[in-house]
Amino acid sequence: MVTYEVTAVVRPELADAYEAYMRRHIPELLATGWFVRASLARSTGNRYRIRYHARDQQSVDRYIAEDAPRLRADFAEHFPAGVELTREVWQTLEEWQP
């Protein structure tokens, strides 16, 4: 499993709009077919983490090449300022469950 993780730091006055946007954006991203599930989490200081889980690295690479430019442009149109993003790809080495 490969995780494509996006961290966002959002100005306080944009937090409600950001959350509403992400509730539409995440299903659109999942509809590309490259990811099998996603989660949205919030921490203190209007910091958010979105995790998109893919079956393999090829799926993440194809998403970045084929669909990310369009979805990122839409995000930038809605939030031209006030949201700082970082993106990372994580390779799952092992998982445990009780």
Roles of regions detected by a PLM:
Residues 14-16, 58-60, 95:
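Residue-level signal for secondary-structure boundary sites
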Residues 36-49, 74-98:
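Glycine-rich beta-strand-turn "strand-cap" elements at beta-sheet edges
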Residues 14-37:
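Short amphipathic alpha-helical segments
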Residues 11-14, 72:
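Serine/threonine-rich low-complexity intrinsically disordered regions
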Residues 2-9, 37-68:
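Short, well-ordered beta-strand segments in beta-rich or mixed alpha/beta enzyme
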Residues 20-23, 62-73:
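Short amphipathic alpha-helices in soluble, non-transmembrane regions
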